Amino acid sequence: MATYHSTRSRTAQLSAKEAIRRGIAPDGGLYVSDELGQSKIDLEGLANKDYFELAREVLGTLLPDYTADEIAACVDEAYGSTFASDEVTPVVDLKGVAGEADQGSAPAYVMELWHGPTSAFKDVALQMLPRLMARTSANAEGAADKIMIVTATSGDTGKAALAGFADAPGCGITVFYPEGKVSRVQELQM
């Protein structure tokens, strides 16, 4: 099973669930697995999968201590009804869009990342993370301890984090933002 250690030290070896639960290593580093470069994913096979299948396969490979059922539930909960597009992050052909270059130019595509509940690209991650955290062993059903997320924002991250953790079992969230330094819309969203 893959273990995770800090980018600043190899002292502590953690499971994926424990690394997700802790978030940041005690030395301030990020958690990473040495097996990341060794994990094999069939890239050609991914090309024909929808977002849900793709997410299940990639997350299942990178987070081996989560069961296939846990990963599937996280993916379905995170993206099933919270995104405006069934494709979650649709890739759109820019052909025919105003301002397109000459017909002889290379095809151009763009991935739309604003279909989440707060229209911020951060929704893609912040809808998944709370579901993964809610399934960490120390926060499993019936556990007495809770996870408290404390974060700061100067914009879209705050609302995306609040939306992601809003219904996460065993998790709470507090978002700080600088008074008068976020837009009125962002302030109202939070």
Place the predicted regions along the sequence by residue.
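PLP-dependent amino-acid enzyme catalytic core
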Residues: 1-190
